[in-house]
Amino acid sequence: WLYRADVFEELGLEIPTNKDEFYNVLVKLKEAYPNSYPLAFRSFAGTMNQMNMLAPVWGTSFMDTEDNRFFGYDYDSGEWSFGPTSPEFKEMLEFYNKLYKEGLLLPNFLTIDTKGWQDVIANGDSFITLDYLSRIDFFNNSMRPSDPDFTMAYMAPAAFGSEGQAMFPNSAKAMMGFVVSSQTKKLDD
């Protein structure tokens, strides 16, 4: 999770540690900035990859992106489960639906492209997001010349739901990469 530390400091907000605190922080942000949507995600090229990052902290699963299975493995019971039919998944959807209905979640979070999402964060229209940690430097480096107080920072995950735990699941992973051979004749190019 990433958050605007400068805005939290300005409003005297603490990092939330559970679902209720998370909700209350969003409400306080909305009260202070009525035209904002305090929580924003980006669509990850039209996928629902946010669910892969969100579901495990609720004690459920969404989709294995490596082979497109909607199953999760429960290490405690030793059984596979179909995440989207679990009570925890329903609880998660109900929570985000509540945020959506109350204007606490960016309305186009499932379709907004990366540029639009960047603009929402940079313009101060949203203050909490879920993305790669490298985005901290991306936002701080690009925003501080015009707003020296702008501070995007890491926010430890809150425990969500009755079965949730404070964790960041291994869902944001690269499945490919680029390499340059040390034997190339154009190594210095």
Residue ranges and their predicted role:
Residues 1-189:
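Extracytoplasmic/secretory soluble proteins
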